[in-house]
């Protein structure tokens, strides 16, 4: 926590025309979540008193996504995109009564780090601009500093040669006291080529009024913004490199790190082992000592210590694997809990199910959980044995230590310790196969 209370404003109103997409730019996915989710996730580390997301293009879709990412975040609507200063002014009414530090972030700039945000929040200056030393300053606005801090921000088109030689440039991210923003935002003009109101005018206005204005710097990589599909692909590659490095540093073994793909919130314990070509979607936790074998896809699931998954397995949202559970190849599990020591070896679908401790699920077992309208649950007790190719037609319960015969279709509850058979009686016709084949060949010959 910082000494001053903190509020976040995340600007997410732009259309992103260079993305060539009907989807709002901030909803394109990076690390398995919408771009705007990265700013919200990092900002959460400051424990902000309020979060406001400014939406414009595709506002309804943005609001829906934000509600899932941070249910406490508020939405401010910027109906006309008239610049960053105008966007922040639309958010301020949502911060009525807030007195503290406001940090303005961008929904399309996903890599601003926790330490950088903490520096912006804790800095004693009245206004703090986030800058970076650019390898190629290009057309960035230059930050002109002096003994008393930031003197001015000079846009490239307005800069002389000496100013253009400055490599310290503006990221666009800004932190300022809420009272100062309320005072100076109405003073911003739009006398520029675009006719827009720019947040970058705030430092100059504040300095002219005697306020302290400073610069905090970060690594250039943190400021990577995304405006095109190519930049999105580059950002995904950069995100994965960082995520893999972090996992290795945390004690995770990966047999081929370059083939493992992480989501923003992937959490893997030390001494877990991850095989090649594993994909983690959002919402996955893997405890210490678990093993994910090659070619698995996991999303919205929990894998306990000692469990093994794969190869070629899929864990979907709501899958909960207890300790020492084994999930083998070509198994799909959704919204199901497998208690400690349960085994599902191969070729199985478990949906909306609870599998008890040390139960064995035979190959080809399917929980028939959907009747075309509603989902239904399957309950399987501890130490049960489900024979291969069993169809469990939910809602149904198989008791503890019970068994089902291979090929059974189970439509009624099976008591504890019982054996259930639900298949037609086998009939053997001696010699019929030979006679039938002879007749068929004769018919074909005619």
UniProtKB/Swiss-Prot annotation:
EC number(s) from the headed UniProt entry: 2.7.7.23, 2.3.1.157
Q: Indicate the family of this protein.
A: In the N-terminal section; belongs to the N-acetylglucosamine-1-phosphate uridyltransferase family. In the C-terminal section; belongs to the transferase hexapeptide repeat family.
Cofactor binding mode and count: Binds 1 Mg(2+) ion per subunit.
Q: Where is this region: N-acetyltransferase?
A: 251-446
Q: Which cysteines are joined by disulfide bonds?
A: none
User: Matching SUPFAM superfamilies, A to Z?
Assistant: Nucleotide-diphospho-sugar transferases (SSF53448), Trimeric LpxA-like enzymes (SSF51161)
Q: Which gene encodes it?
A: glmU
| Binding sites annotated in the UniProt record for UDP-N-acetyl-alpha-D-glucosamine | 11-14, 25, 78, 83-84, 106-108, 141, 155, 170, 227, 316, 334, 349, 360
Q: What is this protein called?
A: Bifunctional protein GlmU
Q: What is said about its interaction partners and assembly?
A: Homotrimer.
Catalytic residues in the record: 346 (proton acceptor)
Q: Does the keyword Repeat apply?
A: yes
Listed binding positions for Mg(2+) are 108, 227
> Can you quote a single GO CC term?
cytoplasm
Any Pfam family matching the protein: NTP_transf_3
Reactions performed catalytically: alpha-D-glucosamine 1-phosphate + acetyl-CoA = N-acetyl-alpha-D-glucosamine 1-phosphate + CoA + H(+); N-acetyl-alpha-D-glucosamine 1-phosphate + UTP + H(+) = UDP-N-acetyl-alpha-D-glucosamine + diphosphate
The entry's acetyl-CoA-binding residues are 363, 369-370, 388, 406, 423
As for what it does, the entry says:
Catalyzes the last two sequential reactions in the de novo biosynthetic pathway for UDP-N-acetylglucosamine (UDP-GlcNAc). The C-terminal domain catalyzes the transfer of acetyl group from acetyl coenzyme A to glucosamine-1-phosphate (GlcN-1-P) to produce N-acetylglucosamine-1-phosphate (GlcNAc-1-P), which is converted into UDP-GlcNAc by the transfer of uridine 5-monophosphate (from uridine 5-triphosphate), a reaction catalyzed by the N-terminal domain.
Q: Which GO terms describe its biological process?
A: cell morphogenesis; cell wall organization; lipid A biosynthetic process; peptidoglycan biosynthetic process; regulation of cell shape; UDP-N-acetylglucosamine biosynthetic process
PANTHER family associated with the record: BIFUNCTIONAL PROTEIN GLMU, NUCLEOTIDYL TRANSFERASE
Compartments reported by the entry = Cytoplasm
Q: Which NCBIfam families match?
A: glmU, PRK14353.1
Entry-linked PROSITE patterns: HEXAPEP_TRANSFERASES
Q: Does the keyword Metal-binding apply?
A: yes
The pathway where this protein functions is: Nucleotide-sugar biosynthesis; UDP-N-acetyl-alpha-D-glucosamine biosynthesis; N-acetyl-alpha-D-glucosamine 1-phosphate from alpha-D-glucosamine 6-phosphate (route II): step 2/2; Nucleotide-sugar biosynthesis; UDP-N-acetyl-alpha-D-glucosamine biosynthesis; UDP-N-acetyl-alpha-D-glucosamine from N-acetyl-alpha-D-glucosamine 1-phosphate: step 1/1; Bacterial outer membrane biogenesis; LPS lipid A biosynthesis
Give the organism the record lists: Paracoccus denitrificans (strain Pd 1222)
For region Pyrophosphorylase, the annotated ranges are 1-229
Q: Which cofactor does it need?
A: Mg(2+)
């Amino acid at each position: 926590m910082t000494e001053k209370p903190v509020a976040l404003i995340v600007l997410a109103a732009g259309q992103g025309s260079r993305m060539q997409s009907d989807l709002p730019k901030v909803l394109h996915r990076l690390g398995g979540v919408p771009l705007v989710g990265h700013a919200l996730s990092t900002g959460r580390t400051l424990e902000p008193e309020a979060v406001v997301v400014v939406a414009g293009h595709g506002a309804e879709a943005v609001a829906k996504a934000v509600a899932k990412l941070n249910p406490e975040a508020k939405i401010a609507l910027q109906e006309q995109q008239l610049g960053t200063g105008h966007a922040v002014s639309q958010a301020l009414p949502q911060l009525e009564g807030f007195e503290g530090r406001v940090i303005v972030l961008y929904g399309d700039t996903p890599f601003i780090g926790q330490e950088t945000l903490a520096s912006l929040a804790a800095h004693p200056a009245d206004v703090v601009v986030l800058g970076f030393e650019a390898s190629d300053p290009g057309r960035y606005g230059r930050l002109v500093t002096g003994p008393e801090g930031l003197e001015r921000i000079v846009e490239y088109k307005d800069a002389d040669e000496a100013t253009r030689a400055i490599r310290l440039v503006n990221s666009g991210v800004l932190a300022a006291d809420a009272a100062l923003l309320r005072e100076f935002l109405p003073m911003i003009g739009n006398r520029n080529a675009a006719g827009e109101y720019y947040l970058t005018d705030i430092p100059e206005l504040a300095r002219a009024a005697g306020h302290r204005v400073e610069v905090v710097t970060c690594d250039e990589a943190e400021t990577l913004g995304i405006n095109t599909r190519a930049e999105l692909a580059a950002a995904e590659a950069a995100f994965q490199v960082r995520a893999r490095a972090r996992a290795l540093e945390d004690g995770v073994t990966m047999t081929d790190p370059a083939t493992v793909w992480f989501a923003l919130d992937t959490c893997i314990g030390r001494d877990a082992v991850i095989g090649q070509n594993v994909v983690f979607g959002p919402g996955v936790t893997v405890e210490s000592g678990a093993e994910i074998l090659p070619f698995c896809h996991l999303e919205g699931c929990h894998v306990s210590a000692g469990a093994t998954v794969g190869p070629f397995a899929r864990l979907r949202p709501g899958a909960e694997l207890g300790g020492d559970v084994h999930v083998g190849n070509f198994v799909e599990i959704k919204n199901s809990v497998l208690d400690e020591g349960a085994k599902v070896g191969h070729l199985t679908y478990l949906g909306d199910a609870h599998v008890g401790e040390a139960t064995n699920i035979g190959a080809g077992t399917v929980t028939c959980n959907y009747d075309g309208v509603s989902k239904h649950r399957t309950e399987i007790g501890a130490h049960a044995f489900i024979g291969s190719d069993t169809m469990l037609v939910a809602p149904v319960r198989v008791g503890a230590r019970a068994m089902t015969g291979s090929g059974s279709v189970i439509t009624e509850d099976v008591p504890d310790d019982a054996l259930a058979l639900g298949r037609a009686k086998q009939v053997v016709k001696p010699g019929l196969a030979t006679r039938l084949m002879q007749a068929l060949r004769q018919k074909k010959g005619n």
